[in-house]
Amino acid sequence: MADTENAGAALTSKSRITLAKDQASCDLAGEMAIVNFENGVYYGLDPTGARIWKLLDEPLTIEELCRSLARVFDVEQSRLESDVRVFIGELARQGLVEIT
C-alpha cells in the first residue's frame, strides 16, 4: 500500500486508485456504507462520494476519474481535480483505497 500519511500530496494525474481488499460496501439509497475490516470502522459517503466509490469498482487513474466526473458535474476542472485528490487522499488515509 502507498504511504497513506501523505497520500493526498503524492497523488498525480497518473496515480492509479484501487479499492482496498479489506473492505465491503453497499449502496443505501444513493449513499454508500463502507466497513474497513482491518480496523472495524464504518464509513458513510454522500451521493457524490458514492458516485466516486462506484467508479472505482475498476482501478482508475486520477485523470480517468476526473474525466468521468466532469461529464456529470458542472465544475471548473482545476477545482474538480483538487477536490478529487483531497477525497482520494482521505480514503487512502482511512485504508479504503490503495494508490500506485
Q: Where do the language-model regions lie?
A:
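Hydrophobic packing positions characteristic
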Residues: 1-23
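Long, charge-rich, low-complexity alpha-helical segments
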Residues: 2, 28, 41-100
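Detector for Asparagine
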Residues: 6, 36-39
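Short boundary/linker motifs that mark transitions into or out of structured domains
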Residues: 16-36
